[in-house]
Regions:
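Glycine-centered hinge/linker elements that transmit conformational signals in sensory
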Residues: 187-188, 231-263, 308
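Hinge/lid segment of periplasmic solute-binding proteins
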Residues: 105-158, 212-219, 302-306
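Short helix-initiation/N-cap motifs at beta->coil->alpha
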Residues: 79-88, 179-186, 261-275
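C-terminal lobe and pocket-closing loops
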Residues: 292-298, 313-318, 326-426
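Conserved N-terminal structural module of periplasmic/extracytoplasmic solute-binding proteins
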Residues: 2-110, 125-129, 174, 333, ...
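Extracytoplasmic/periplasmic solute-binding protein
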Residues: 144-153, 158, 168, 182-234, ...
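Short amphipathic alpha-helical coupling segments at ligand-binding clamshell hinges
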Residues: 59-62, 244-248, 332-345, 446
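Short, solvent-exposed loop/beta-turn-alpha elements that line the ligand-binding surface or hinge
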Residues: 121-133, 177-179, 200-202, 222-244, ...
Length: 460
């Protein structure tokens, strides 16, 4: 699930959107290229979530000018944007959706099924890098018709984020973060006792509770669903790994009193609490550092990241990401401009040295994060080469992230569940909340019901 991870965790209720497309579909007879009629094409592009600092927009202004200098027939208009699945259909119908925006991998399948993404197959082929993508990642933007509906732009793996100051205040070594779930629990208890802060916290609402419970199930070797040979799915929520993940939460909360007092956190609020120094550790995507500093004001010196402990047979690390897409309502002139922007703004910096350096310089000059750990959507070799290109501009404290960057390649990446992803995440939210708010919650009973409800969704 990611970008600002707000984009990667919101629930999806898009059924109405499919009905709206007929009324707002573009006129495909208009095959003009950008500016072909002598007029500038106005292109509305997504920028940042509400709350982004001025420096982020300063950097964007530099990049906007660079693009417009290269494409004088296109007028880029930045639009404040935050992905929220439940409002997507309304934005689509009301015309408030940017022409270019990003959506998480987990939601792209739903949008594809509803016909709510623009086909960019030929455009990607013309750009010449369709075959450069990791095939597993490209599959996430490929419809059942074999066509491509977006540009994978970044991916992440789950990480354990920790506050170095709280570690030091508790007498723990921030350069030696926990490597097992038992050690996480032990350190969380020490942090809570020594500092009065939450030693460990976890998301629990707006589908993020299910997202993180799934991640911690995978880390213990379990899976919440299986795909059958005929393409159908079987729910496997009630498994030993999920039971263990919930028992861990119960013990941190009720036995150790190390969870703090907030049991209704989501991606935004847990980041806010962590950035404010109120949480010792939590799990989230490895790319969250940028948002923590840019949107939530975290002091970089306080930040640390390590891998999520993998324990048991078939253990892995949940990953996700997001894609850049074109609104299905635009005409072909705007579509052509949109693809130019996506190629320039999102893609070229992943594979072209000059573009990577220009992007890194613009961000660095504006005080924005450069070098936040991500997973490559292309090849690992190309990703590592790109880090050498931008090395002079890297300003994130990567030495404080080496427990993650040194070990993530040894873990097995696992994609998010494909069947009814967000809906089932939503089903699991109350399970997490129950364990955190009811000392006597019956974990097996909760998971049995969730399994039944999830299977009903998968059978639709």
């Amino acid at each position: 699930m990611s970008i600002g991870r707000n984009t990667a965790i919101a629930g999806v209720t898009l059924a109405a959107g499919a009905l709206l497309l007929t009324a707002c579909s573009p006129d495909e007879s208009d095959n003009a290229s950008p500016g072909a009629d002598g007029k500038k094409v106005e292109l509305r592009v997504a920028t940042f979530p509400p709350g982004a600092d001025k420096a982020a927009y300063d950097a964007f202004a530099v990049q906007e000018k660079q693009f417009e200098d290269l494409n004088p027939d296109i007028d880029v208009i930045g639009v404040e944007y935050e992905w929220t699945g439940p409002t997507f259909a309304v934005q689509l119908a009301g015309g408030s959706l940017p022409d270019v925006f990003t959506v998480p991998f987990t939601d792209s399948k739903t949008l594809l099924e509803n016909g709510q993404l623009m086909d960019v197959t030929e455009e990607m082929k013309a750009l010449g890098y369709t075959d450069k993508f990791n095939p597993v990642i490209l599959d996430g933007v490929t419809g059942s018709d074999g066509k491509i509906y977006g540009f994978p732009r970044q991916a992440y793996a789950m990480g354990l984020h920790y506050n170095r100051d709280l570690f030091e205040a508790a007498g723990l070594d921030p350069n030696k973060p926990p490597t097992t779930w038992d050690e996480i629990r032990k350190d969380a208890k020490i942090i809570a006792e020594k500092t009065g802060k939450a030693g460990y916290a976890q998301m629990a609402i707006n589908n993020t509770g299910g997202w993180q419970l799934t991640a911690e199930t995978v880390a213990r070797g379990g899976r919440t669903q299986e795909q059958n040979a005929d393409g159908t799915f079987k729910s496997t929520i009630n498994n030993p790994a999920t039971v263990a993940a919930l028992q861990f939460l119960h013990d941190v909360r009720w036995t150790d009193n190390a969870f703090g007092s907030k049991y209704d956190l989501d991606w935004g609020t847990i980041n806010q609490e962590f950035a404010a120094g109120n949480i010792g550790m939590y799990t989230s995507g490895s790319d969250v550092y940028t948002a923590l500093v840019r949107d939530f004001g975290m002091n970089p010196d306080q930040y640390g990241m390590t891998v999520v402990p993998n324990e048991g047979e078939n253990a892995g690390t949940l990953g996700g990401g997001d894609i850049a897409v074109v609104s299905p309502t635009v005409d072909s002139t705007t579509k052509a401009a949109a693809v130019k922007w996506i190629d320039w703004y999102y893609m070229q910096k992943l594979m072209n040295e000059d573009a990577a350096v220009a992007d890194a310089k613009a961000l660095s000059d504006a005080g924005q994060a450069v070098g936040t750990p991500v997973l490559p959507v292309l090849s690992k070799d190309l990703y590592e080469q790109s880090l050498t290109w931008i090395e002079p501009y890297i300003n994130v404290p990567r030495d404080q992230m080496t427990p993650f960057t040194d070990n993530i390649w040894d873990q097995t990446p696992v994609g998010e569940p494909k069947g009814q992803t967000q809906a089932i995440y939503g089903l699991l939210d109350p399970v997490v909340q129950s364990v955190l708010t009811d000392k006597n919650a019956d974990i097996n009973a909760l998971l049995t019901k969730a399994d039944t409800d999830a299977q009903a969704l998968l059978d639709k």
